[in-house]
Amino acid sequence: MYRLYLRPFLLFLFAFGTIGWASITFAAGQNPIQIPPLKAHRTRPLIVIVADNKGTETTDLVVPHGIIRSAGIADLLVVSTHAGVVDLMPALKIRPDTTMSDFDREHPEGADIVIVPAMHDDRNRNVIAWIRQQFSKRAMVVSICEGAWLAARAGVFDGRRATTHWYAFDKMKRTFPRANWVRNQRYVVDGNVVSTTGVTASIPASLALVEAIGGRAKAQSVAAGLGVDGWSAAHDATPFRMTTGRLWRFAANYLAFWGHETIRLPVQDGFDEIALALAADAWSRTFRSQALVVEQAASIRSRNGLVLVPDVSAENSASSMEIPLLPPARILDDALSQIAARYGSRTSDIVALQLEYSTRH
């Protein structure tokens, strides 16, 4: 599991973050996304979400997959470093569509758009080299959250405007001074490079991609189905900061191991992958619970074709948490409310902090 990969444990909470899509008052200007010319003989874009089998952030990968597939405006593939199951962090497992090497053989001209989620190993040389190669073939690169580390190491941000998760921002600014780092925008567009803040910024950024490819009416239709009013880049990062009280809550939850529990999320064929990802991500960030999918089937397919691999086992005492029938983007609000009721408002606060999600509606 993801928590075991990071030492000391407090680094875990900042490895990946997200940004909320709630209404805010902070104004931010943004250029529209302009899709590069399609590769020869294509009638619509070929979009790739690259994944490291050893650890790729859950919402960073699943949300763009669900939004783009549901829009029906592009061909989309999840491309992994090697064959086999992709472990998502902090929860879920999926099967990719193909591998980087197989993709290169089948599509030597490259992808039109490459989406880069945050990954456990943000120094993975194979992933970085592959991103660099795709960028050299005129692919648009879209980094989600701390996928920015991989994109930056591939040289994608050199001389360009970019952003990332609030906690990583200052370190990335020091590490990659050739980029122009931008605060207080959920996503930043600079030519054929797009970057976002935290994990949930994948929703507005994905909708902006849908608008660029399929038009505003299509994006509005998809947004309505998600329960989202818009996809503005406006964002106020000021509330997202570490405080002594929050540090104590992380430590207290982590150290109270006798109170840790497993949360089982029932899933059936045709499930909504966005709703599942948001629920699993939230429940697995409390430092008191871990979300698992435990079903008899060897694999389960979402309504948009994502193949989920259930976790092989769970404790007999695992609590079952039904995902409510709400618009997918509202599932996070529901999860935070349930977390507050179960563990207290301070725990729901640190979950929202990790997700860089604004609870001010």
Named regions from a protein language model:
Residues F26-V141, W149-R153, R183, L207-H361:
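Extended, subdomain-level signal for the structured scaffold at the beginning of enzyme domains
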Residues A154-G155, G191-A212:
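Short alpha-helices
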Residues D158-N184:
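A conserved active-site-flanking secondary-structure segment within enzyme catalytic domains
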Residues N53, R161, G191, S195-G198, ...:
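Glycine- and other small-residue-rich loops at beta-strand/loop junctions that grip anionic moieties
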Residues M1-L6:
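N-terminal secretory signal peptides that target proteins for export/translocation
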Residues V182-V194, G227:
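Conserved Rossmann-fold dehydrogenase catalytic segment
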Residues F9-W21:
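Bacterial N-terminal signal peptides
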